[in-house]
Amino acid sequence: MQASFTPVACWDSADLPKGLLNDSSPQTPWSVEQVVASLPGGPPQSNSSSPVPFFHMLERLKTTKREGWRRGESISDHMYRMALITMFAPPSLSSRLNIPHCTKMALVHDMAEALVGDITPVDGVSKPEKNRRESTTMDYFTQSLLSKVNNGMTGAELRAVWQEYEDSETLESKFVHDVDKIELVLQMVEYERVEEKRLDLGEFSWVASNISLQEVKDWADELLKEREEFWGGVEHKKFDKV
């Protein structure tokens, strides 16, 4: 069966051309409390000295699908492959990076989507509103679920790593942002391969043009070359820099 997709669904809103994000706000403001109250079994226990309530929350990352494809991968699927990819930074890059920190960041960067979901530009949620939802979700995790676990230190560390990724100022965070894009391009190529040329996802490939580090650009070039060889002489949407 041919898969379906939404052309801008998996793109990072920060990388989209201006105008693709809608500034409209929901009539009923989104809140962590509202989502948590709707969870099966009710809200997890707050202010517990055990991390088990938080472990239950992580299940949502396993079951919440990434947007953009039918039968898409889960958020955890995406973050797990990203975490492994960080371990393969070539020496010219790894010598300048704290690789274990990058791996941790890859495993944390989309954690807020356990409650927020995988918001995409077509959802009509403005970037400030998206940031608000994700930030308040991380605050809920760290202040309500993890505040008494290891004296709150583990939760505070998760929050700090997530914020570092969001700020995208350190070399580690820039690398993980690039890995996020590479994982998307990998998935694009793999979905096309599974569909045996019945599905052209070339509209996703421009994401590669926003990769900043040369070593990761080299991976992207290899992937796009692989894609061209796969399509051969068959007409398809080609990668164009924007």
Name each region found by the language model.
Residues 1-242:
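Alpha-helical, largely C-terminal catalytic domains
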